[in-house]
Amino acid sequence: MIDVTFLGTVSGIPSLERNHPAIVLEYSSDERHFLLFDCGEGTQKHLMRSGISFMKLQKIFISHWHADHFSGLIPLIQTMNLEKRREELQIYGPEAERFVSNILDLGYFGLRFPVAAMNVPFSGEEPTLVDSNAEYEVWSIPVFHTVPSVAYLFKEKDRLNINLEKIKELGLKRGTWMKKLKTDGVATVGGKKIKIEDVSDVKPGLRVVYSGDTKPCANVVKLAKGADLLIHDGTFLEEDEGKAHADVRQAAKVAADAGVKQLVLTHLSRRYSTKEDIQEIETAARKIFPETKVAYDFMKVKLKN
């Protein structure tokens, strides 16, 4: 299960209603994992208000190094340090080693815990695997912005579910051997070796894509193919050629082209402050991609397989 919490949903200048960009993705399976995507000003306070412990954050993925997307890192790291964190914090992003080093120099932290900076490629047209464990993967791909910037894909790993009909077809009966099959991937029944893939169906993992700041681009479409949720830059209602951002119709077109299940628009300009503004944005986007929502601070999206 995946819980996505939007901590900040405005673009470059914050408003009283909207904080700078930050999104928490909580993944619950055999273990609980807390990942933060971007960390704008005020992120730690919104973490507190949301009831999510910043001490549980294991990894932070920065899309790019504009201040509205990373300026919350300095106070967040300081608070973790004051709260006597000991676990390593991993920070990913384009040129992360350089920027994280500068951030740590600025803070005079005297860190009691390790902070690891992980560089993410910011050129090319193919996704790159940047993080992986037994339960999920995180991929990145470069996008179109004024500075090196990337989109991220969180991908739950596919699972095998035992199909009882396939077991019957092999003339087998349910038994304790099935537990060994799940644990080891293979079991011997009546002198016959059974592999788990012989009696299982593949259950595709959940997929969430975060575009970061970008104009509409083919790389996001590629990364988001068939995703359960696409979180996309929707800064403007109307196209603005002078800005390296998407308008809401362009974002909806990306969602349609990628064949995603849901689209959430975020990174809205502060000019859109009324209910009527949000309704106009939703109406415009839904004409192209009906399953569209506009994010607001503390909004939650739950995904289940």
How would you describe each model-predicted region?
Residues 1-52, 86-88, 152-154, 200-211, ...:
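Conserved beta-strand hairpin/beta-sheet module of binuclear metal-dependent hydrolase folds
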Residues 72-80, 102, 273-283:
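Metal-dependent catalytic neighborhoods of phosphoester/phosphodiester hydrolases
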Residues 89-96, 261-265:
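Short internal beta-strands
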Residues 181-299:
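Cap/insert and terminal regions of metallo-dependent hydrolase folds
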